[in-house]
Amino acid sequence: MKKYLFLCIAVVSLALSPGQAYAQRYLPKMMGVELRGGFVNGSKSPLNYYTGIAMSGYTKKANRWVVGAEYLLKNYDYRGTSIPRALFTAEGGYYLKFLSDPTKTFFLSIGGSALAGYETVNWGDKMLHDGSTLLAKDAFIYGGAITLELESYITDRIVLLANVRERVLWGGSLGKFSTQFGLGVKFIIN
């Protein structure tokens, strides 16, 4: 009988305790794998999109390093057809956490990244469908990006991501700036 009474008291006291326990998140040396994707320069055309994969590593002050790769496709209209511009880029960046809620469920970060990669226009084909010659050339590109990212922990190991990013890339034949709006998922692996 004493055993049941002790068990009932323990359950009631735990249920009524005002303290809450939260998961361990944003700890140093935690690593995560991100899968991301979204639209480029708004969602005017579903043909303008990006997708990528990245690895995140957290630091002592709840900031993180990000290393990854992205594929971006943007189509330009030309006389009733579209001319594709594809970018293959590698990223290395650092994100600063500047806002989080008390339950450590939502985190808002701002980050800067260095980008380098390759741009191809119309997949290297210079002749267009109407006989015109495309002057844009394939090229190596370099530049950077500024990102605002919201992380929402679904579980201790699964995180939903939402971000807005402005990229600037030099070396290519077409526009330097592109804005990205995207979503992603991150899996914490340790």
Task: Mark where each language-model region is.
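Cleavable N-terminal export/targeting peptides
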Residues: 1-28, 190
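Short glycine/proline- and aromatic-enriched beta-strand/turn motifs that initiate or cap beta-hairpins
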Residues: 21-74, 186-190
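Residues that define the transmembrane beta-barrel architecture of outer-membrane proteins
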Residues: 29-31, 45-51, 82-90, 106, ...
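Residue-level detection of beta-strand scaffold positions
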Residues: 34-36, 48-50, 56, 64-66, ...
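Extracellular loop and loop/strand-boundary signature of outer-membrane beta-barrel proteins
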Residues: 38-41, 76-83, 130-136, 168-172
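Gram-negative (and chloroplast) outer-membrane scaffold detector with strong preference
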Residues: 54-129, 187-190
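Predominantly the C-terminal beta-signal and adjacent terminal strand-loop region
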Residues: 72-74, 146-190
